[in-house]
Amino acid sequence: MSSDITGTAAWQKLRDHHAQIQSVHLRELFEKDPARGQELTVTAGDLYIDYSKHRIDRDTLGLLLELARSADLEARRDAMFAGEHINTSEDRAVLHTALRLPADASLVVDGQDVVADVHEVLDRMGDFTDRVRSGEWRGATGERIKTVVNIGIGGSDLGPVMVYRALRHYADAGISVRFISNVDPADLVRSLQGLDPATTLFIVASKTFSTLETLTNATAARRWLLGGLGLGNEAVAKHFVAVSTHADRVAEFGIDTANMFGFWDWVGGRYSVDSAIGLSVMAAIGKERFAEFLAGFHAVDEHFRTAPLEENAPVLLGLIGLWYSNFFGAESRAVLPYSNDLVRFAAYLQQLTMESNGKSVRADGTPVPTSTGEIFWGEPGTNGQHAFYQLLHQGTRLVPSDFIGFGEPTDDLPTADGTGSMHDLLMSNFFAQTKVLAFGKTAEEIAAEGTPEHLVPHKVMPGNRPSTTILAPKLTPSVIGQLIALYEHQVFVEGVVWGIDSFDQWGVELGKTQAVELQPVLTAAEEPAAQSDSSTDSLVRWYRRQRGRA
């Protein structure tokens, strides 16, 4: 059985330490240690990370690192990189880090050279996307491809759509990418609106080629394509490719298995954007930029693998997240990128973090004795400032925040008076928000400005709201890879300390099964039998009446 981390000496010391530090304000911490703004920073690849605005001191850090060592973090990290089967419930290795190993690396797992396998697929992806981007690949009517449509869900959608939007400036071949994920037909109808079937290529991303939502949408897309072209099934092979490992099902659909790109059981969906699941991204930005994307991941992988825990960005940030979850009782973390190109980053992190660490049992099947799984959410700045920052600043809930910003913009324009940069204006808001969250403004300071007495309490900014600042020179393919890897490894750190399996997702399965069972109940011509609970029974009957099926 896994040891109970809450019974370790390090956990008890942290509990005692929290009792002492919980009422200490960040103002006091900075007054006591004026250099903390320079010293409580860490660099990983191109990422400059300031964690000084957290409710920690050097004793906190020492105790958190002691906790990590009590959980055998370093050995668990090494086991993951070595390909040991750390996903115990599914008896699998966890090797998303192998997806970005350079071609001259070597990693043999279960008797297979996984690096050679990875680069064989990458080479095939590169050859295929070169043909699409150059116009060599033609549709069934002889026209070149202008739009790629990725059909997938979960990790087969969230990663590609996030990265494509982040790297839109690098889409240089005149190919746009759209994404279909939801089984709600409105998603497909909207996504196909205005497209020409003759110039559209679909990527169907499903490892088993049996995912209900994906195959439903792919079938509808095939119907749209053939109807629009006025051609038979032979046209499918010119307009559909697959990311899958199930050749029989792919061929049955009408896709040439020569255009099927596989990945492996040791890659979880939420860790797969740098695998063949990223084919749509490669089609947009090209294989050279995709290689830079992978190199960014690898840079942070190597940092995580080799840096001492005291200087290890994912370790420090993961432990700080755990500090708030388990000792301050915080339930969520806001992710606030000051880049509109990262509009889908928070949604991507929701799956990465919450599907990984939203567990109530440990790897050995025993109950987790403490809270797990931070709730991730957020929006790009400055939009969030006019929506939910009120709660961050003056609400009663503690919400640690991650601010992500860039030295150079992907776009820039003059300010309203024509004398400045809109990016500078954006970043002035960025730095102001982290400052105000940390230090706030006291009642005395507000009263001294002549504020009417009855308004003073309403205008007090309490501060002491923690945040991490993550800066990079520019949002590039390498940098987005680095950002993703930074959060991937934070997830791992928290999961190891909690003793959970961060790489399975059994909690999503029962709902799928029940949906399959309920579909004929909703659609049958005859009145259905009573459901097992009165709520579901009455809801099903309401829906049937709306659809004219009494």
Curated annotation (Swiss-Prot):
PANTHER family in UniProt: GLUCOSE-6-PHOSPHATE ISOMERASE (PTHR11469:SF1)
SUPFAM superfamilies: SIS domain
GO molecular function, a single term: glucose-6-phosphate isomerase activity
Protein name: Glucose-6-phosphate isomerase 1
Functional summary from the UniProt entry: Catalyzes the reversible isomerization of glucose-6-phosphate to fructose-6-phosphate.
HAMAP family, A to Z: G6P_isomerase
Entry's family note: Belongs to the GPI family.
Metabolic or biological pathway, per its Swiss-Prot or TrEMBL entry: Carbohydrate biosynthesis; gluconeogenesis; Carbohydrate degradation; glycolysis; D-glyceraldehyde 3-phosphate and glycerone phosphate from D-glucose: step 2/4
Keywords: Cytoplasm, Gluconeogenesis, Glycolysis, Isomerase
Database matches in InterPro entries: G6P_Isomerase, G6P_Isomerase_C, Phosphoglucose_isomerase_CS, SIS_dom_sf, SIS_PGI_1, SIS_PGI_2
Keyword Cytoplasm in record: yes
Keyword Manganese listed: no
GO CC terms of this entry: cytosol
EC number, as in UniProt: 5.3.1.9
Localization per Swiss-Prot or TrEMBL: Cytoplasm
Catalytic site positions: E355 (proton donor), H386, K512
A biological process term (GO) from this entry: gluconeogenesis
One Pfam family cited in the UniProt record for this chain: PGI
Record field: catalytic activity: alpha-D-glucose 6-phosphate = beta-D-fructose 6-phosphate
Source species, domain of life: Bacteria
